[in-house]
Amino acid sequence: MQNKNSMLFRSGKNLLVYGLMFIMLSIAVDWYRKPSEPNAFAQQVFYDLQQQPKVIAQLSHQKPMLLYFWGSWCNYCKFTSPAVQQLMDDKVAVLSVALKSGDPQQVADYLNQENYHFPVINDPDGEISKSWDIQATPTILIIKDGKVVQHTTGLTSYWGLKVRLWLSSLT
């Protein structure tokens, strides 16, 4: 019996150690890939695929919003985009940037095929993403009152984003 308890304790300890190592590695990778926001980005007017104006300062006023850089060619985005869509369905303000994913019609076709309805700014040449120094897709920035308060790169989940949004709303 004592041997079984000892084995359970060691397994739990190993799980905790490996979990903490994973979290620390994830934080280090996010720090390394940290985007840098362009000057006066919050006041810029962007136009989505439907030619509707989008201003980050307005979208992030009083509540955090997601700025989501993705690509139709990105394998990790195929797992992250449904979480972003679910947050959009939950009434979270979302603005996305389709990085080098084709012309506006190709991006619209991809969105229809995948049943995504979040607003998309097309970045066919990568100029917008370059101005943010985006190094990986997906990259998600959480912006509140026109200021970047959190960011993450790579694979993420609905609940991971939900917790980040909640923490951002506390500030």
PLM region spans:
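Thiol/disulfide oxidoreductase modules built on the thioredoxin-like
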Residues: 112-116, 124-169
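Short active-site neighborhood of thiol/selenol oxidoreductases, capturing the structured segment around
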Residues: 55-78, 84
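Loop/turn elements at helix/coil->beta-strand transitions in domains of secreted/extracellular proteins
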Residues: 62-64, 90-93, 118
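Hydrophobic beta-strand anchors of alpha/beta hydrolase catalytic cores
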Residues: 66-67, 94, 140
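Short acidic-hydrophobic, aromatic-tinged amphipathic segments that line or gate anion-handling sites
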Residues: 47, 119-123
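Structural microenvironment flanking redox-active thiols in thiol-disulfide oxidoreductases
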Residues: 78-114, 124-130
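N-terminal targeting signals for export/organelle localization
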Residues: 1-47, 171
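Short, small/polar residue-rich loop motifs at catalytic or cofactor-binding pockets
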Residues: 40, 63, 135-137
